[in-house]
């Protein structure tokens, strides 16, 4: 299988051979959905918290007498039935949101995403993305010349210049193959892979 090799103007300069085991796999929507949801679930910090009727700060005094008022009987204002009362089943910080995805499924799902991106024309190969200076404007101008507004770059090695130049650009994410994730691959409109990263992707997801 071959993919377009883009020049610095974003035009197809030539073709480059890529492994079919990574870039020409069958589209599996269910598997992609599963690994994306699992990745997002495993990234949750679990910091949400609510209080039950024992934790809310309320007086334990009976709000009104048991009989004679016409109201439903009430023991204290911390009851979940009252405004400001505790929750019946509160969310707790120790909740476990993690989902297990085995390595075989994850590799197959990532290869399916990369293959679908290639079929849609959203994935292309560049020779390299080296910068002589860590200037954001230099990288921004490079992407502007290639007509890229939302791009994920998978480079074989992210040096300091490339990292510093890209970290302040909106809708730009530069990473190495080992840190590529399904959510980012699905999110960005264009994915650029350097030639040196192709073998690493094959090693990881074939």
UniProtKB/Swiss-Prot annotation:
One of its GO terms (molecular function) is structural constituent of ribosome. Transmembrane segments: none annotated. GO terms for cellular component: ribonucleoprotein complex; ribosome. Pfam families: Ribosomal_L4. Residues 46-77 are annotated as: Disordered. InterPro entries: Ribosomal_uL4, Ribosomal_uL4-like, Ribosomal_uL4_dom_sf. Keywords: Ribonucleoprotein, Ribosomal protein, RNA-binding, rRNA-binding. SUPFAM superfamilies: Ribosomal protein L4. GO terms for biological process: translation. Belongs to the universal ribosomal protein uL4 family. One of the primary rRNA binding proteins, this protein initially binds near the 5'-end of the 23S rRNA. It is important during the early stages of 50S assembly. It makes multiple contacts with different domains of the 23S rRNA in the assembled 50S subunit and ribosome. Forms part of the polypeptide exit tunnel. Part of the 50S ribosomal subunit. This is Large ribosomal subunit protein uL4. It comes from Acidovorax ebreus (strain TPSY). The gene is rplD.
């Amino acid at each position: 299988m071959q993919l377009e090799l883009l020049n610095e103007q974003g035009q197809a300069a030539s073709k480059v051979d890529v492994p079919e085991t990574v870039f020409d796999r069958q589209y599996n929507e269910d598997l992609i959905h599963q690994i994306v949801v699992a990745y997002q679930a495993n990234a949750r910090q679990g910091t949400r918290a609510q209080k039950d009727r024992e934790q809310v700060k309320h007086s334990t005094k009976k709000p009104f007498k048991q009989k004679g008022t016409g109201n439903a009987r009430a023991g204290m204002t911390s009851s979940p039935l009252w405004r400001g009362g505790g929750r019946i089943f509160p969310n707790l910080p120790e909740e476990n949101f993690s989902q297990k995805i085995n390595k075989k499924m994850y590799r197959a799902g990532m290869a399916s995403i990369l293959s679908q991106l290639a079929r849609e024309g959203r994935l292309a190969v560049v020779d390299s993305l080296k910068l002589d200076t860590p200037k954001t404007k230099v990288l921004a101008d490079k992407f502007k010349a290639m007509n890229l507004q939302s791009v994920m770059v998978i480079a074989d090695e992210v040096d300091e210049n490339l990292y510093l130049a890209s970290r302040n650009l909106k809708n730009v994410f530069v990473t190495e193959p080992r840190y590529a994730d399904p959510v980012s691959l699905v999110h960005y409109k264009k994915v650029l892979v350097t030639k040196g990263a192709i073998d690493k992707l094959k090693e990881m997801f074939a």
